[in-house]
Amino acid sequence: LCLEPALPDGSLKTFRKGVADFTVIAHGRSAHAGADPHRGINAIEELAYQIMRLRQLADPRRGTTVTVGVIRGGTRPNVIPEQAEMIVDVRVSTRSEMSRIEAAFRSLRPILEGARLEVRGGFNRPPMERNAQMIATFERARAIAATLGLALTEGGTGGGSDANFTAALGIPTLDGLGAVGNGAHALDEHVRIDSLPLRAALVAALLTRWTV
């Protein structure tokens, strides 16, 4: 039982995306941008090429997103940067997409002659898929909720939780049993106080009425 917040309408979460953080570091060669530009290998320029490659990995139809969220590099405008790095957030809905993305990052090769790429990181949460076991687990929870007069619904999210790990191990998992609210990570993040007694009653019922 995972007491992550419910969806805004109170739904449990029967699927979550897997999450990865990749760091891609480009190694080039520094030089004076005006006097000796031909001697330099621009690490930021190398990353620019790689960003365009990574854009091609995203697949909205499969729920796969690839987001360059952080980029760092350079020291001064008149110095060709020797090193630059970017941190890339990836979200996937299935294990097959997880494998595809992992392989794609590991196979990145530099575009600029003499440049070198280093890839670190990877997936830190597998996807929580809405498979047959997940559906059966939710249906049992819905039946128990009905005894309390609650009409339990389901949905999913692109964020990860501890439930990603248990579900991937084949353990029956219920996620989103926590408070009902909205605005996660935003200035208007809030919890509906009137939802707390109902959520507590639901968790208590699941603990006491679930039979193996």
Per-segment meaning from a language model:
Residues P5-G10, T14-F15, A20-V212:
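Metal-dependent amide/peptide-bond hydrolase catalytic core
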